[in-house]
């Protein structure tokens, strides 16, 4: 079946409070054949596609500072106490998907290549936080090597840890 051989492209996004702008941005994001999935529906969408026998690759951009409600994993990152979203790790463990670290390498003006590095083929066998910690270490290496390419305005350290939260 042709549909099962095609790769499903889903764009995880945070819905905007302004419904008009939300629809406009969804339309812009979907113009190349992607399909928008609200961030709170990501795991359900992945499960649905897997049940349908569809080929799935889940790419999550997780270098931004999470909202307090999303703050799940704390570690030292660039010498700062930093919180990371752990949704990618949770989905990988739920579905037992292999995990790759992905980075872009600029080759010339306007061109880059995408590099994938295997983190684990067996996420269910990893300790809680291990995948997210590996991501944090790899991201830190990437930033130290190419600091100009990181988007520094993410307000990465706006969240402060409560004393009761465990450190990664």
Regions found by a protein language model. Give the residues of each.
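Single conserved hydrophobic/aromatic residue that forms the stacking wall/gate
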Residues: 1-9
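Small-molecule pocket liners
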Residues: 5, 34, 74-75
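A generic signature of intrinsically disordered, low-complexity regions enriched in glycine/proline
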Residues: 5, 26, 67-69
